Amino acid sequence: MRDRLNYRTTGDPKRPALLLVHGFLSSNAQWQPNLDLLGERFFVVLAELWGHGDSPLPEDHSDFTIPRYVAEFEHIRSELNLSCWGVVGQSYAAGLAINYAIAHPERVTGLVVTNSRSAFGDIATSRKEKAKRNQIAASTLTEKQKNNRHMPIHPIYAKRLPDDVKARLVACADNMTEEAINKGGLIRRALNSESLIDSITPPFMIANGVYEKSFQVDLSRLKTGRPGLKVVDMQGGHAVNIEAADEFNATMIQFFLNP
């Protein structure tokens, strides 16, 4: 039997549907601060990446491609008998969401992505940062490597997360297998979506956590020559949906229900 992404739903199926996809080293716990309010206004679908949360980790490397993720999102939509839905991609999932919206624009009522260096970061800069991280990691693997805390993106280093949410996200990241991390990295380069922005036809918005300074550099470059690019600044950092949950929730309702 073919592996399928794990997903769950909350809210009234008669309401407008909204797909939420979390980022790397995370799980559906990413959306904990958003579900009470969004679940009142939408039929929320939460999907987990391969090897994250309760999603399986396929053996075949061919499953770790953009087209396969796009097909999985379509499978979920079809299985739920939804004609269309809004799509939100957080961090690593931003590139996946953009590719899905371009492949199936007729199914997407609107697209929102959050801060994402994998989708919008300068490739040359990313290479330098990766080399620097590898240098640091080589000298500090020991105990930290056992629970992935040698990775700079591990949520243990997040400074603005509520304690209960942080505890769940840290547990998710600690328990990620090395195989899941390595396979998830197979599509890292393919996630870069800067060249695709102008091909997005559904309504599109970037929910920008202004405290992540490195992403502001990427965003400034994205805005150049794109005066119509919709960006909503929020008082949060990389995990803007958590750190600025009230702003994020209100913006999602406005964007998807009152465009």
Predicted regions and their residues:
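Conserved HGGG/HGGXW glycine-rich cap/lid loop of the alpha/beta-hydrolase fold
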Residues: 5-62, 222
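Post-His helix in hydrolase/transferase enzymes
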Residues: 242-254
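Conserved loop-alpha-helix segment in the C-terminal half of the alpha/beta-hydrolase fold
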Residues: 203-236, 242
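Alpha/beta-hydrolase fold catalytic core
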Residues: 1-19, 39-43, 78, 82-83, ...
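Active-site loop/oxyanion-hole signature of alpha/beta-hydrolase fold enzymes
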Residues: 8, 45-92, 250
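Conserved alpha/beta-hydrolase catalytic His-Asp/Glu region
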Residues: 122-128, 142-198
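Structural signature of beta-strand start/N-cap positions in the alpha/beta core
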Residues: 17, 43, 83-86, 107-110, ...
